[in-house]
Amino acid sequence: ARDAYIAKPHNCVYECYNPKGSYCNDLCTENGAESGYCQILGKYGNACWCIQLPDNVPIRIPGKCH
């Protein structure tokens, strides 16, 4: 497991807008992570960051989102 931006197919992040909201935590835990939160103005803009996301779940890697 690792801490990372969870990715949709095609290497795109899940955008989020409310750092206090539960959207990212729900998304991350549904995918097996310990927790997650909305990182505002991070490397990929406002995106969901997951803590201890299982290795089989795709994460945002360098390169284009397409």
Swiss-Prot record:
Cysteine disulfide partners in this protein: C12-C65, C16-C38, C24-C48, C28-C50
Biological classification of the source: Eukaryota, Metazoa, Ecdysozoa, Arthropoda, Chelicerata
The keyword Mitochondrion is assigned to this record: no
Phenotypic consequence of K64R: In msBeM9; gain of activity on rNav1.2/SCN2A (reduces peak current and inhibits inactivation), important decrease or loss in activity on rNav1.4/SCN4A, hNav1.5/SCN5A and BgNav1, and no change in activity on mNav1.6/SCN8A
Domain notes: Has the structural arrangement of an alpha-helix connected to antiparallel beta-sheets by disulfide bonds (CS-alpha/beta).
Principal location class: secreted
Domain LCN-type CS-alpha/beta as annotated: residue spans: 2-66
SMART domains for this protein: Knot1
Protein name as catalogued: Alpha-like toxin BeM9
General function of this protein: Alpha toxins bind voltage-independently at site-3 of sodium channels (Nav) and inhibit the inactivation of the activated channels, thereby blocking neuronal transmission. This toxin is active on both mammals and insects, since it inhibits inactivation of rNav1.4/SCN4A, hNav1.5/SCN5A, mNav1.6/SCN8A and insect BgNav1 and DmNav1 channels. In vivo, it shows paralytic activity in mice.
Residue numbers marked as site, Key residue for activity on mammalian channels, it controls twisting and flexibility of active residues at the C-terminus: R60
